[in-house]
Amino acid sequence: VDLHGGPTSARQAELQFSMYGRGLLSTQGWAVLSPNYRGSTGYGDKFLTDLIGRENDIEVQDILAGADAMIERGIADKDKLAVGGWSNGGYLTNCIIATTDIFKAASSGAGVFDQTMQWAIEDTPGHVVNYAQGLPWTAADELQDMSPIYEADNITTPTIIHVGAGDARVPAEQS
């Protein structure tokens, strides 16, 4: 499962080479699901804004439903699932592996673990405020619910974590 950044972004319906290797994985026998989960662009305002106040919730449900559909249709092997992404895709990877152990491997690039800390240190904290519908001192519970760090003791999936030493959006200590 290849997760796009954003969340206000989308995967295009095209085969393209990218640093995430979707094209390469396909040539090696992998089926690659690149879902446009709720919060993605291109599906209308409601689809985009449904995510407000529900990060680490409905988009995770969408992604897991997509993986389940791939298994049910015989496209994916439940014993050989992997998940990964960069930026918001890394964040969602963290959320997913803190929620379930169905994936046998994970790759989290610049993936946030703690949304309160993210608000405090990133270069554009406004999106955290928008999705949590408040500041850390007014939306502490919401930010905790959005943060996979609080479920980190549930993570059993072997995971590679990628960081950028000079990343102003998701500093290395956040990944």
How should each PLM-predicted stretch be described?
Residues 1-175:
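Serine-hydrolase catalytic core recognition
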